[in-house]
Amino acid sequence: MKKSKKFGLIGKNIDYSFSKKYFSEKFKKENLDCTYSNFDVVNISEIESILQNNSISGYNVTIPYKEEIIKFLDEIDEVAKDIGAVNSIKKIDNKNIGFN
């Protein structure tokens, strides 16, 4: 049996965000076995433990962590390097790879 995929949003004070509702509805509409959670991070130091969770397939990143999160990632793509910010992270072979 295929395992449910987990995704989430990393940010601060993100209760206002439409992402959880949007992606949850999209997964249901597309009949995808996926969940989406908010990771409301008060302090940047919390991010490392969140990213170590290998059961989560990917994240969206919002303010104020788009730049600060880079130091916690294993790799970032060229666009993210050029911009100096990451807005999505994909877990590939237990590595966190940032994209923009």
Question: Could you say what each language-model-derived stretch is?
Answer:
Residues K2-N100:
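Phosphate/diphosphate ligand-binding glycine-rich loop within oxidoreductases
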